[in-house]
């Protein structure tokens, strides 16, 4: 094989000057060389004085190339005016040199009043958006399709039909949500072109709303671009930036229901904006500080993150005029206070057949954008003369160009990533990233971006630890450009940034569908996309070559109470490597009194353990841990909880019992998916009333599983420590140190490392030593005594369930959510209750196991359905009033409400006394 050592020198004039390319080891350079002449090319780019990127040696894929073609990375060329776009779009997208002119002073209260009415959490350590590899970057995140209005049929429809439990319109959104949170944790400013997270409530506060108060010195703007109504007297307010705070605008909504709320802000961009406008979100648990560069992005909703707010008006968002940069304290730079949004709401854009009424995030992008851009934006940005279906294609890139202020920063400081899934007769598999067929309609470096993401996703899914289904399919071709895609058109996006569509898998293929329904795979796809974008940044700019990836979440947290009432928390590092992420260099531990809202956190200085004071002495303390590195901050670990022995007057009062809470859910898998029934045709009327599955790992992680058992034990005056099942199996904590163990596996199939043979041996020894055990879960009995393609129990599994515990699997309950006590049984005082929880992120409790008692065991709860239908079995003693164990064939956290669970726990503990 020949090796060429020639260099070819090219120059091309672009907006930034003359850029020179030195290309060595060049394949297919148009001189009749064989495609087999070389296997790699080394590319160096410079301006003559500054290296734009380090020399990169890239493998050359000759598939489909003629002997005289090669795709080279070239700098942005001088564009033709508007790239052929209509003049209205060119004008709408063009960055202007807008600056505020002195305006009428706004009526405002003294700044001291803002301090007097601020959240008490202002005095506690604040939380911050992490800094990381995407700090300073603006990412426009998109998810294809969604509920769309059909003018001819006058109905709303999904653009893709149901198949294998998946509707692409919703799966794309779930994928974007995961990606958005990874971006936020990596320091990015995220502009979602469909809403982030699931929150049907909404509160939108404009600067003129009664719930908005101004403090200090503000002025009225005369801008013609703003959020609100066409007749608003004051478009918005602005204040001069200063090193010390002299102006605050406070947006205090009435939150109708406690929950996790995405928070968005709307501010016009401009030349005189500060580079880091400060927003303080006072939510339950902490005050979080976020900075947005409104010289770079504006005129639409920018996502600040998602935060837990309690019902009422205790939470708020402040806009502050304080800046760190002394250059911006010059009397010329300003901060802007226009609108703040809490939650997503439901569809309310009018159409001839009415408003959709669907959860707004499930609608197509054009409706969110229409409600986002303000009264003076050109409606052609989000509409189409043809149909709403057409509008969903053009809206995202046009909106990105409209919101982006391209004169601030460089081409690589922003990017648009859109998520879809693919279909091709059920036969194709794998990830494909897209770029446009027409070279004239490709934003600069688009093919490179597509190739890097497509390669990364496929490679990581192949190499990731095996899932419980067929392996990821290796693809020869990881990109596709068979047509010119509207979402990616250069004229729509005005070449202000690069853009690609990531078709993460083929939803019409049964094997790929298994990946799409698995949150672990969805997380891998999002993380691989993140790394692919970073690779693209690094290929184009030398300063980006060292960018890292945020770590994975810490594993196996354990919370123990110490004799002096303090709390010891320990954990293990998350997996690190090219696939998972870079190693953590520090950890941050967060505490909560509720398990929902956490404080600002504290660094452990790299240690894998910490000792904390309890939040209160009479209620549980909840803890979670994150890992940090130069790439950002990981997702949080599992939540663990502890209730120390209660402290009295200088002496320790020991509660009547001590327990260990074990979270058996250690893996994200398809059992954590949420079912969704839509009483409306999807893309196909035959799908009416069918179930689609939503993959929402963040909702799953935040679900109140640990809280349910912790609150019930607290009501029974039982102190406890907690961990997950892997911590037990790996010897981090001993069962025999606790007289009572409550082991919960939720809806997860416990075959994947939860009740392994060694763990079963530990439980058997614990019971022989006189320990008391409560096992609960929807599929635990089926996994250990049933027979299905997904779960084939071993002989050890069956012996454990049948001989040690004295019960057997009898079938599956798919009908009844009502559970009743067996008359005369040990739980006869428990009131009849209903299995609930799907709306809380706990997942649908059905189907759940039906069990039967063996030997000296006895049935104590039954599903309210005809036939043999035991929902709980108790046993372990010849005394029918006391025993060693209780088995609940449903998740404890799904048992009715808080009062019901407290009564159920009290009766169970009475039996296990």
Task: List each language-model region with its residue ranges.
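Aromatic-Pro/Gly-enriched surface loop or interdomain linker
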Residues: 181, 186, 194, 352, ...
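Catalytic-core regions of hydrolytic enzymes
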Residues: 129, 135-143, 147-203, 207-218, ...
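Pro/Thr/Ser/Gly-rich low-complexity, intrinsically disordered linker/stalk tracts
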Residues: 538-581, 632-655
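A short beta-strand element within beta-rich, extracytoplasmic domains
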Residues: 247-271
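A glycine-rich, often tryptophan-bearing local segment used as a flexible ligand/cofactor-contacting loop or short
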Residues: 747-844, 856-858, 864-866, 904
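Beta-strand-rich modules
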Residues: 612-634
């Amino acid at each position: 094989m020949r090796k060429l050592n020639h260099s070819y020198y090219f120059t091309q004039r672009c907006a930034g000057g003359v850029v020179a390319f030195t290309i060595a080891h060049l394949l297919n350079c148009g001189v009749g060389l064989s495609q087999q002449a070389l296997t790699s090319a080394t590319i160096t780019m410079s301006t003559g004085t500054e290296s734009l990127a380090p020399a990169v040696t890239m493998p050359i894929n000759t598939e489909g190339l003629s002997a005289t073609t090669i795709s080279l990375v070239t700098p942005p060329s001088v564009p033709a005016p508007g790239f052929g776009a209509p003049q209205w779009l060119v004008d709408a997208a063009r960055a202007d040199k807008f600056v505020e002119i002195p305006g009428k002073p706004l009526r405002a209260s003294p700044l001291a009043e803002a301090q007097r009415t601020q959240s008490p959490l202002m005095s506690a350590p604040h939380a911050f958006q992490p800094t990381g590899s995407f700090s300073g970057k603006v990412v426009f995140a998109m998810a294809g399709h969604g509920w769309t209005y059909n003018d001819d049929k006058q109905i709303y429809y999904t653009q893709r039909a149901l198949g294998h439990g998946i509707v692409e319109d919703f799966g794309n959104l779930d994928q974007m949500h995961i990606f958005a949170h990874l971006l936020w944790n990596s320091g990015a400013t995220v502009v979602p072109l469909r809403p982030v997270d699931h929150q049907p409530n909404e509160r939108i506060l404009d600067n003129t709303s009664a719930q908005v108060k101004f403090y200090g010195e503000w002025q009225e703007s005369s801008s013609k671009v703003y959020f609100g109504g066409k007749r608003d007297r004051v478009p918005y307010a602005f204040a001069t930036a200063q090193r010390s705070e002299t102006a605050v605008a406070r947006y205090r909504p009435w939150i109708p229901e406690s929950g996790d709320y995405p928070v968005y802000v709307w501010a016009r961009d401009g030349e005189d904006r500060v580079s880091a406008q400060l927003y303080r979100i006072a939510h339950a648990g902490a005050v979080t500080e976020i900075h947005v560069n409104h010289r770079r992005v504006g005129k639409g909703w920018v996502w600040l993150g998602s935060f837990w707010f309690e019902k009422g008006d205790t939470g708020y968002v402040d806009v502050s005029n304080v800046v760190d940069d002394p250059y911006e304290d010059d009397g010329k730079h300003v901060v802007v206070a226009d609108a703040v949004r809490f939650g997503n709401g439901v569809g309310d854009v009018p159409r001839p057949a009415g408003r959709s009424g669907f959860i707004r995030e499930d609608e197509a992008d054009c409706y969110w954008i229409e409600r986002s851009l303000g009264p003076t934006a050109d409606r052609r940005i989000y509409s189409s003369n043809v149909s709403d279906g057409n509008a969903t294609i053009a809206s995202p890139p046009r909106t990105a160009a409209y919101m982006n202020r391209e004169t601030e920063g460089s081409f690589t400081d922003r990017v648009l990533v859109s998520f879809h899934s693919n279909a091709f007769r059920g036969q194709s598999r794998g990830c494909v990233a897209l770029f446009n067929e027409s070279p004239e309609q490709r934003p600069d470096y688009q093919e490179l971006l597509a190739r890097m993401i497509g390669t990364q996703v496929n490679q990581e899914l192949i190499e990731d630890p095996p899932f419980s289904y067929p392996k990821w399919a290796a693809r020869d071709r990881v990109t596709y450009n068979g047509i010119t895609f509207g979402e990616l058109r250069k004229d729509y996006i005005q070449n202000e940034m690069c853009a690609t569509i990531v078709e993460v898998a083929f939803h019409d293929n049964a094997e790929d569908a298994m990946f799409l329904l698995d949150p672990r795979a969805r997380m891998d796809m999002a993380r691989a996309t993140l790394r692919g974008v970073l690779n693209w940044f690094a290929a184009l700019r030398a300063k980006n070559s060292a960018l890292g990836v945020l770590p994975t979440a810490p594993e196996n947290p354990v919370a123990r109470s110490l004799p002096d009432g303090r709390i010891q928390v320990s954990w293990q590092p998350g997996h690190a490597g090219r696939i998972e992420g870079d190693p953590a260099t520090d950890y941050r531990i967060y505490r909560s009194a509720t398990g929902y809202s956490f404080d600002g956190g504290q660094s452990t200085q790299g240690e894998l353990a910490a000792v904390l004071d309890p939040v209160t002495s009479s209620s549980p303390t909840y803890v979670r841990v994150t890992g940090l590195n130069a790439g950002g901050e990981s997702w949080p670990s599992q939540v663990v909880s502890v209730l120390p022995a209660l402290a009295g007057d200088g002496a320790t009062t020991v509660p009547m019992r001590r327990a260990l809470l074990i979270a058996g859910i250690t893996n994200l898998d398809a059992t954590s998916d949420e079912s969704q029934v839509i009483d409306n045709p999807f893309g196909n009327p035959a799908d009416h009333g069918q179930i689609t599955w939503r993959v929402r790992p963040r909702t799953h992680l935040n679900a109140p599983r640990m809280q349910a058992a912790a609150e019930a034990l607290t009501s029974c005056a039982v102190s406890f420590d907690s961990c997950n099942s892997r911590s037990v199996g790996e010897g981090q904590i001993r069962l025999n140190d606790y007289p009572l163990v409550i082991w919960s596996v939720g809806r997860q199939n416990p075959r994947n490392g939860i009740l392994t043979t060694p763990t079963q041996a530990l439980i058997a020894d614990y019971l022989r030593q006189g320990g008391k055990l409560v096992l609960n879960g929807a599929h635990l009995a089926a996994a250990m005594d049933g027979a299905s393609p997904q779960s084939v129990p071993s002989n050890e599994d069956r012996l454990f369930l049948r001989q040690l515990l004295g019960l057997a699997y009898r079938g599956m309950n798919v009908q009844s959510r009502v559970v009743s006590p067996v008359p005369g049984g040990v739980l006869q005082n428990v009131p009849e209750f209903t299995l609930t929880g799907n709306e809380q992120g706990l997942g649908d409790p059905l189907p759940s196991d039906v069990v039967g008692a063996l030997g000296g065991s006895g049935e104590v709860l039954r599903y309210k359905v005809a036939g043999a239908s035991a929902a709980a079995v108790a046993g372990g003693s010849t005394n029918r009033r006391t025993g060693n164990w209780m088995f609940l064939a449903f998740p404890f956290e799904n048992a009715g409400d808080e009062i019901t669970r407290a009564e159920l726990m009290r009766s169970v503990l009475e039996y296990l006394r």
